[in-house]
Amino acid sequence: MIVGMETENTKNANHRTGGAARRVVELSHPIRHGMVTYPGLPAPEISVHLSREASRDHYSPGTEFHIGRISMVANTGTYLDSPFHRFGDGPDLAGLPLDGLVDLDGLVVRTVDAQDRAVDRDALLPHPVTGRAVLIHTGWSRHWGTDRYGAGGHPFLTARGAAWLAEQRPALVGIDSLNIDDTDDLARSAHTTLLAAGIPVVEHMRGLEQLPLDGFRFHAAPPAVEGMGTFPVRAYAVLPGGEHQR
């Protein structure tokens, strides 16, 4: 039994560091055996490499461990795309500077009530995005885990919107939708433009409705895996105490 660990019910509770209250907001989907992230891609397979029972033969009485095994495609759950995902000569996961993935000044662009599923430049123009983690809140994450999520008609960033962002140089762009591109656009204009500019992309986010428009720090660092362009991340935001949605 583990004593003193944070439980599911307290993940978003207030924490105190140096006397100042803060709140941590989960922005990633849990990865579960057999779950579907993107239609057509295989689901993760989670199994046991070494069971607790089998491990007892290797240790002192009363000592046991569990070693798990997971087989999955890189595009599973909430994940980050590096330029290598699109371009063979771009930085892979290990080539991304860590300071461009963590403790970023966060900004939410809310398009939940928009009539058009296309997030165009006009939705972005009012926002100072340079150097920030720009998180596009479409509300599509409410369909996660249902057939609707991957059935088409998801919100996406237009080619014009991506081009404007690339010019403004945000640190990172995220979205709570199936794909940052319209999947009917086989050129994948948003991926192509942003990753060519060296701007990482985080897809399949959740929980953006819990964030204010700004005033929070964003974190989304994948493992430093060489030769891979995409991998799941534990994305989260840190808010000062007393922050609320607006």
Q: Where are the regions a protein language model picked out?
A:
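Active-/binding-site microenvironments in catalytic and ligand-binding cores
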Residues: M1-R246
